[in-house]
């Protein structure tokens, strides 16, 4: 997505 590493 746009945060950490969640795509």
Swiss-Prot record:
List the keywords (alphabetical): Copper, Metal-binding, Oxygen transport, Secreted, Thioether bond, Transport
> What GO molecular functions are on record for this protein?
metal ion binding; oxygen carrier activity
**Where are its TM segments located?**
none
List required co-factors.
Answer: Cu(2+)
From which domain of life does this come?
Eukaryota
- Location of this chain's protein in the cell: Secreted, Extracellular space
**Co-factor binding comment:** Binds 2 copper ions per heterodimer.
A GO cellular component term found in this entry reads: extracellular region
Q: In which tissues is it expressed?
A: Hemolymph.
The entry's comment on post-translational modification says: Forms a thioether bond between 2 amino acids.
- Function in brief: Hemocyanins are copper-containing oxygen carriers occurring freely dissolved in the hemolymph of many mollusks and arthropods.
Whom does it interact with, and what assembly results?
Heterodidecamer composed of A and B subunits, each containing 8 globular oxygen-binding functional units. Heterogenous decameric or multidecameric structures may also be formed.
Family the UniProt entry places it in: Belongs to the tyrosinase family. Hemocyanin subfamily.
Protein name as catalogued = Hemocyanin subunit B
* Organism whose genome encodes this protein: Concholepas concholepas (Barnacle rock-shell)
